[in-house]
Amino acid sequence: MANKIGKIIQVMGPVVDVDFEDYLPAINEALEMELEVEDKKIRLVLEVAAHLGDNRVRTIAMDMTDGLVRGMEVKATGDSIKVPVGEEVLGRIFNVIGDTIDEGEPLQAKTYWSIHRSAPPFEEQSTKEEIFETGIKVVDLLAPYKKGGKTGLFGGAGVGKTVIIMELIHNVAYKHSGYSVFAGVGERTREGNDLYYEMKESNVLDKVALCYGQMNEPPGARNRIALTGLTMAEYFRDEMGLDVLMFIDNIFRYAQAGAEMSALLGRIPSAVGYQPTLASEMGRLQERITSTKKGSITSIQAVYVPADDLTDPAPASVFAHLDATTVLNRRIAEKGIYPAVDPLDSTSRMLDPNIVGEEHYKVARGVQAVLQKYKDLQDIIAILGMDELSEEDKLTVERARKIERFLSQPFFVAEVFTGAPGKYVTLEETIEGFKGLLEGKYDDIPEAAFYMVGNIDEALEKAEKLKAK
């Protein structure tokens, strides 16, 4: 039996070199040590990243390396980082090594899985093209999500990314009675904290597992936290045969942390200073997010675009993997239309008559055509006013304004601060409503009736009330 105890020979920030006498730990193997910080015992995990020769390894620390000195003992575990999986993880917050950090009861998990896993083989992958109904009108109609697909959620600060994420978690929990996993990758601690309490208030916490690797943590933790969350989601898919929703906020920070790790390990950087392995790292993560014949993982990934440059290598490496994009627009939020999804910028591979059907496709393209025409006419309206438009254009503008308002909808998770009860709208109801609007069935109804309602029947009810007033 080889001696699995090694000694620290060098510490460079989050990178630690360890020397073993007669044992060589494998790449990605977890090494453990106990540290005393302010009279508290802390389990520090180091992950092997490179072999330096002569039984020496270079490792990345999953926590702060304050207090480490040369000569300290490190124990090899003989395995990679393992995290708890199964229904026990729901409603709890985890760090990268699978320890709970919500100060709750000790975790009673029966099963632990390694965070480094292979993507499912080709023969197990499902090739069905199916829509994932979210209950959010603008998404289901114009840029539908693929079941087991990947969607990028693009938006600046304060346009409602987190609210959409919470609404999706709510709708999955109640309509599909499914589970969700949320991985906060390089998140602000405050946002993670807010999300936890908001979920608690809106009663969705017991259907979701939260994994946080915040901004203040070393790059190892910020990079690997995405794998921790994904492993929990994979268990629900493979062992329980469920359709899981996986949220990653923010996928850019995953690439960013990888770049930091790469530089610390002394690798030569590639374009814009990113790691030379950016595409393969991203591919390894994204290939695990897929549908199998047992279940599916549908992922929604928030994408931060540095300096609004879509050609930056990090966001560009994400684009290749996405099936749909949901773009949030501040101009729409300023009009008071929530969710502030841009109906003309958001795209989906699923919006194809062979997948969604002829009717859905025609209605969606019709809605986009009317909104595009309205956008083109806005300059004329701003300079000359509505009166200068032809009768046909006036009608287009009126319909477009109604469509714009009908694309808004009250959210369940926003009930607390809007006072309006949330609405889940099925795909059939969504198509029926917009089809009627395009055909001119509702031309005599005031546009105020379409604002913040669910299906078309509610808009007609609201119109009756407005008339009565």
Swiss-Prot record:
It is a peripheral membrane protein. One of its GO terms (cellular component) is plasma membrane. Produces ATP from ADP in the presence of a proton gradient across the membrane. The catalytic sites are hosted primarily by the beta subunits. The keyword Protein transport does not apply. This is ATP synthase subunit beta. It comes from Nitratiruptor sp. (strain SB155-2). It is an enzyme of class 7 (translocase). GO terms for molecular function: ATP binding; ATP hydrolysis activity; proton-transporting ATP synthase activity, rotational mechanism. Belongs to the ATPase alpha/beta chains family.
